[in-house]
Amino acid sequence: MALRQCAIYGKGGIGKSTTTQNLVAALAEAGKKVMIVGCDPKADSTRLILHSKAQNTVMEMAASAGSGEDLELEDVLQIGYGGVKCVESGGPEPGVGCAGRGVITAINFLEEEGAYSDDLDFVFYDVLGDVVCGGFAMPIRENKAQEIYIVCSGEMMAMYAANNIAKGIVKYAHSGSVRLGGLICNSRKTDREDELIMALAAKIGTQMIHFVPRDNVVQHAEIRRMTVIEYDPKAKQADEYRALAQKILNNKLLVIPNPASMEDLEELLMEFGIMEAEDESIVGKAGAEG
């Protein structure tokens, strides 16, 4: 199959890295050749695949080598569970420089060194947070990733973030081939969560590609720095990640999204009881005062 390059975006703390690594493990289990490129200075995008605390990053290795030109591919690329290739872009010290620059440096380095080999089926970019700014937009902006998946939940801020990311996709879609492949709902067990995310997906012109239920086995696996696929392959949650992998494998619905207005989003939240109809008299009042 032709190489498919996918980027996973979503609000910080929503479970992007965990979801991505479990999805990738399921694809590897199904015989697919996959590379993960972590695009987050925290460098935690590959820890469950490699069973490690944090992988050495391209930026760290380039700094210690003197320059990127002195780096070799084997210095930064490690092989983990199921033969998955793992790379972390890394970033500068907190408060110094642009972390997005690490993403640009890493992807350019990987291309120059032949990391995107012909045998690869998928490359997944696990991208920091909900900002689609300069460096972090690189997988979209430079047409590296053709498919974007947004991890969200039924919480208000996760939905706002998903809508903002959709706006970023629109900005670059008209000048390139990037498309939204769908929303992945990583459940927080909020009320009517699956219905709400399906409604949000319909509102912005995409699909909820899969609803991943909340299960403590994910945390049990993470403590051991493992994916659920590897830690407990017979668990129901492992089958959820396999189902997500199959849906992405077979996904043909790649769209330029139509982001919702703030009013539309608030109406949706009111419809599902997440937000009360606006009443100026209660704004800023504590619960006890109401």
Curated annotation (Swiss-Prot):
Q: How is the cofactor bound?
A: Binds 1 [4Fe-4S] cluster per dimer.
CC cofactor? [4Fe-4S] cluster
**Residues with the ADP-ribosylarginine modification:** R101
Q: What is its EC number?
A: 1.18.6.1
Biological processes annotated in GO: nitrogen fixation
Assembly, per entry = Homodimer.
Q: Which family does it belong to?
A: Belongs to the NifH/BchL/ChlL family.
- The name on file for this protein is Nitrogenase iron protein 2
